[in-house]
């Protein structure tokens, strides 16, 4: 009767055989193209940004790389604008319009779960925006390459909350948009 080696013994044998055949230049920590090695080099901020992009693409339904986000602060609230980079990219344009239409419905109901899913945290200002939702208006406007959500309110506390929310978006999406109040278009 022949005894078959256990799975653990086979794994151990393969592991040790692999080590003996391994050349120093093959070790992951010495290969610049090794994904695990590269991941170790990434700062926590870069890891967060990668997560925002990956989660955002999944939640929003369109690519960050093929679109541009802008967050603008106005004296009566602000705006969220998303546009396809390529005027011929009607798939991104349509996905943007669909997503922002959905966001208008959610935000008007005081539901800010979509930004939390993208940013892995509740953005500043959302608790106040939820509490003051009856004083805030969200209007969807189609643009040539996407859409805009115009956020307006006459409530001073709500304006401050909207501005906190938009400033967070500017920073977390790395848009480079001004964080000061500008004139509405």
Question: Which residues does each PLM region occupy?
Answer:
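Bacterial N-terminal signal peptides that target proteins for export
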Residues: 1-9
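Intrinsically disordered, low-complexity terminal tails/loops enriched in metal-binding residues
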Residues: 11-185
């Amino acid at each position: 009767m022949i005894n078959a080696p256990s799975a653990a013994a086979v794994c151990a044998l393969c592991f040790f055989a692999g080590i003996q055949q391994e050349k120093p230049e093959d070790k992951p920590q010495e290969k610049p193209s090794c994904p695990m090695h590269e991941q170790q080099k990434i700062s926590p901020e870069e890891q967060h940004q990668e997560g925002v992009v990956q989660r955002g693409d999944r939640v929003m339904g369109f690519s960050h790389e093929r679109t541009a986000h802008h967050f603008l602060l106005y004296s009566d609230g602000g705006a969220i604008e998303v546009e396809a980079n390529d005027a011929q990219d009607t798939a991104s344009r349509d996905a943007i319009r669909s997503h922002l239409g959905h966001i208008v419905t959610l935000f008007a109901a005081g539901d800010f779960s979509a930004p939390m899913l993208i940013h892995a945290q509740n953005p500043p200002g959302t608790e106040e925006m939820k509490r003051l939702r009856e004083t805030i208006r969200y209007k969807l406007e189609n643009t040539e390459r996407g859409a805009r959500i115009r956020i307006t309110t006459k409530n001073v506390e709500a304006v401050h909350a909207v501005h906190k929310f938009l400033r967070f978006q500017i920073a977390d999406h790395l848009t480079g948009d001004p964080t000061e109040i500008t004139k509405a278009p």
